[in-house]
From Swiss-Prot:
Belongs to the CobT family. Pathway: Nucleoside biosynthesis; alpha-ribazole biosynthesis; alpha-ribazole from 5,6-dimethylbenzimidazole: step 1/2. Catalyzes the synthesis of alpha-ribazole-5'-phosphate from nicotinate mononucleotide (NAMN) and 5,6-dimethylbenzimidazole (DMB). It is an enzyme of class 2 (transferase). It catalyses: 5,6-dimethylbenzimidazole + nicotinate beta-D-ribonucleotide = alpha-ribazole 5'-phosphate + nicotinate + H(+). The gene is cobT. Pfam families: DBI_PRT. The active site is at 319 (proton acceptor). The keyword Transferase applies. Keywords: Cobalamin biosynthesis, Glycosyltransferase, Transferase. NCBIfam families: cobT_DBIPRT, PRK00105.1. It comes from Chlorobaculum parvum (strain DSM 263 / NCIMB 8327). This is Nicotinate-nucleotide--dimethylbenzimidazole phosphoribosyltransferase.
């Protein structure tokens, strides 16, 4: 497993920045003042560079919603009981969740991935069964996952991305479902980005002040308990992460290895993206951060990464909802790039010198 993981990392190539001039020249020749479409032009530029072409296409999109349970839920850090995780997976499989509506609206396929739910699901056409274990261990008492389990989850996610590329998908999005997963996400940010737990811990699904203070204490305890196992990014992910977070990390690494961009959802998915970046800094150029989460700390995380999310809608649901919305903006930017007339083709006079 370790050899395959190292091969995955080695297969991630830097993007070709030499495309920049050709893409910019085309954007500047469109029938508009240069730069007047603002971030749409930036997004089109990034997509072209990530995909390695000045003639981009986007015909197939897919959202992967990774699900997993967390042992740390036993510490009472969430407003909801752990059994909500499988219940929400069933809701997604039945078409009733927000991500079902928004992925459909975006014209994206949706697949739910069981990475570590504490429940056994029957086969379903929308479900991919990649279960590593029935939930992570309680990170407040020791490592959430072993290194082998973490690698298994990462490689499963990577294989999903590589398979999607082979099936003709050109853009992927991440989502997640897992009660208590803002707790491991916050711990990952704290260690990997050297951020204060107190400053970035939020209310998740809506906990009160008393439980928020308790959540902060649990995260700080988990970091201290696992202090001896935090030497590398992989060890940090194993000790303080979760199966769905590791799966998303793998999806990002796998997509980058085949030159495919990924739209990252909110607070949880961004923690997986941080893990992927720490494992291979080259993946940054393949990532679109979809939205600024309303979860406390996400703004500071984005600033640390030097990232500017596409949307700011006060979302804090997860599931991939923000990523599905942002996919539509990316698609709009590419339609501008591909379908607008140029000054030369339309016979429109350019700007006076």
């Amino acid at each position: 497993m370790t050899d395959r993981f190292q091969q995955l990392l080695a297969s991630i190539k830097p993007v070709d920045m030499n495309l920049t001039s050709a893409v910019k020249a085309h954007l500047d020749d469109l029938t508009k003042p240069q730069g007047s479409l603002g971030r749409l032009e930036e997004i089109a530029m990034k997509y072209c560079i990530a995909t390695g072409t000045s003639k981009p296409s986007l015909s197939k999109k897919k959202v992967f919603c990774f699900a997993g349970d967390h042992g740390v839920a036993a510490e009472g850090v969430s407003a909801f009981p752990a059994e909500v995780t499988p219940q929400m997976v069933y809701n997604m499989l039945g078409g009733g969740a927000a991500i079902n509506v928004l992925s459909r609206h975006a014209g994206a396929d949706l697949e739910v991935v069981d990475m570590g739910v504490n429940h056994d699901f029957a086969e379903h056409p929308m479900l991919r069964r990649c279960k590593v274990k029935h939930g992570s261990a309680n990170m407040a008492e020791g490592p959430a996952m072993s290194i082998d389990e973490t690698l298994q989850a990462i490689m499963a996610g990577a294989e999903l991305a590589i398979e999607a590329r082979e099936q003709g998908y050109e853009l992927l999005a991440t989502g997640e479902m897992g009660i208590a997963n803002t707790t491991p996400a916050t711990a990952l940010y704290s260690v990997l980005l050297d951020m204060s737990v107190n400053a970035i811990t939020g209310r998740g699904t809506g906990i009160d002040d008393e439980r928020l203070h308790h959540k902060i204490a649990v995260i700080e305890k988990a970091i201290e308990v696992n202090r001896a196992n935090l030497a590398t990014p992989l060890e940090v992910l194993a000790a303080l992460g979760g199966f769905e977070i590791a799966g998303i990390c793998g999806l990002i690494l796998g997509a980058a290895s085949v030159g495919m961009p990924v739209v990252v959802d909110g607070f949880i998915s961004s923690s997986a993206a941080v893990c992927a970046i720490k494992l291979s800094c080259k993946v940054s150029d393949y990532l679109f951060f979809s939205h600024l989460s309303n979860e406390q700390g996400h703004r500071a995380v984005m600033q640390k990464l030097g990232a500017r999310p596409i949307l700011d809608l006060d979302l804090r649901l997860g599931e991939g909802t923000g990523a599905a919305m942002a996919m539509q903006v990316i698609e709009a930017s590419l339609k501008i790039y591909n379908e607008m007339a140029t000054f030369s083709s339309a016979g429109v006079s350019g700007k006076n010198d």
